[in-house]
A protein has these predicted regions:
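Structural/interface elements that position substrates and couple domains in central-metabolism enzymes
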Residues: 1-444
Length: 444
């Protein structure tokens, strides 16, 4: 019955969690004709979606043309019911779990949102329903956590209802690789679960890749993000060494990238942020420790990335010394709050650590980001007012806005002997006056 509903696009899709994954996913289902219920307990998030404040999160699934974009948004709105009332999920044939899976203060998995979501689904679970977990979890968590909670409904996974894990794969701000173009990995508790989830996703994405088990699907997500984590850590570590050796890390990466095989460029930066890369190593480490396995390499890489914001402060102090200035007596402008270029997301952003630590030392610090009002307690204003009269400019995020607003020209208008610390190799130092002391992370 569900198979036919999926084929006819008459299945009702319930998506729990409308964050950076759940909102685009719910919109994608609605775009493809499915009646979709988007559920989130946060009324502010719902208000932001309904007002269009976060519509940029749909860039990967909407046309660029303004008229066509508005037409597609109208289609989505027609099929998408946004709600914070559980009762509106009662008619769902498919439940997708897209809630956050953060860390506790001791850097172990915090699965409270996942657990509460499973309990909510339990209320409306019926025979023939398909439940798909997209939230990132450690290998084995669907079997250990999700399955028992859902079976409190009195129904049996794999017999009475279907259970699948399909890791979310989304790159916020990436307009080339929108959700529809990213291959979808699908694992399940049995073949029927895999087949149903695969047929569902084939309705909204170009490529579906079934795998043999829930654990393989869970591990795929871990491997993808750990690959990035350890390679970013490698280049972050090397960049410190190259700096001391008088070697330009960025030029070295560009040269190595000319090799047509066996090399994938990663770039140094002020630390990792967002919903996955800073967190996922600790999910895997938790599971590894439980199984008596030591993943020293993964642990070391996570530590290197976590400490990069403090290295930025070291570079700031070092650059100020060239101007005979100290951290305590200097004024600062920090440019960029979000965790990466041209996105709204501030979760686990390295900027928070840099701002917090500098505020402990200096009472004169301002922060500016064109995409968010978050300042972590610091003062903010326009870009011009933020950098005006400051001893040191710290560029944390390479937003397109800074290029479009001629950041180099604005810096040149500042007083001589100003310092600039560029953590993204973004500023064109050749355009800066010689009186400006410029330092780029990864360059001598």
């Amino acid at each position: 019955m569900l198979k036919q509903k999926i084929k006819d696009t008459t299945a009702v899709i319930g998506i729990l969690g409308l964050g950076h994954v759940g909102y685009p996913m719910s919109s994608l289902f609605a775009k493809n004709g499915f009646t979709t219920v988007g559920y989130d307990i946060n009324p502010t998030r719902l208000k932001d979606i309904q007002s269009g404040k976060v519509v940029s999160e749909l860039d990967g699934i909407l046309p660029v043309n303004k008229k066509k974009r508005q037409e597609k948004l109208a289609e989505i709105e027609k099929n998408l019911n946004l709600t914070n009332e559980e009762e509106n999920l009662k008619n769902a044939d498919v439940f997708l779990i897209d809630v956050p899976t953060p860390l506790k203060e001791n850097e172990t998995p915090n699965l409270v949102f996942l657990e509460n979501t499973c309990k909510t689904i339990c209320t409306f679970l019926k025979k023939g329903t398909l439940v798909i977990v997209e939230s990132t979890i450690y290998p084995g968590a669907t079997q250990e956590i999700v399955k028992p909670l859902l079976e409190e409904s009195g129904l049996c996974a794999g017999t009475d209802f279907y259970l699948s894990f399909s890791p979310e794969r989304i790159d916020p701000g990436n307009k080339k690789w929108g959700l529809e173009k990213i291959p979808k990995i699908v694992g399940g508790i049995n073949k029927q679960s895999v087949d149903l989830a695969s047929s569902l996703f084939s309705k909204i994405v170009e490529t579906v890749i079934p795998v043999s088990s829930l654990e393989v699907a869970e591990s795929t997500k871990m491997l993808e993000n750990l690959f990035r984590s350890v390679n970013i850590a490698l280049i972050n570590d090397l960049s410190k060494f190259f700096e001391k050796m008088g070697i330009d890390t960025w030029e070295t990466i560009a040269a190595a990238s000319s090799k047509p095989f066996g090399f994938l460029p990663h770039y140094p930066g002020p630390g990792v942020g967002g919903h996955c890369i800073p967190k996922d190593p600790f999910y895997l480490l938790y599971k590894a420790n439980k199984s008596g396995t030591n993943l020293e390499f993964v642990e070391e890489a996570a530590a290197i990335n976590k400490n990069m914001p403090l290295y930025v402060i070291y570079l700031v102090e070092k650059t100020l010394k060239l101007c005979n200035k100290t951290l305590r007596d200097s004024s600062f402008a920090v440019l960029g709050v979000t965790y990466k270029r041209d996105v709204l997301d501030i979760r686990r952003t390295p900027s928070k650590t840099v701002v917090t630590e500098l505020c402990k030392i200096s009472k004169n610090l301002m922060i500016f980001d064109p995409l968010t009002d978050e300042t972590f307690g610091a003062k903010t204003s326009t870009l011009d007012e933020t950098i005006k009269g400051k001893d040191c400019i710290v560029l944390m995020v390479d937003h397109s806005y800074f290029r479009e607003n001629n950041l180099e020209e604005k810096i040149n208008e500042l007083s001589p002997n100003c310092c600039v610390v560029d953590t993204r190799n973004f500023i064109d130092s050749k355009k800066l006056k010689k009186s400006i002391h410029y330092k780029c992370l990864g360059k001598p």
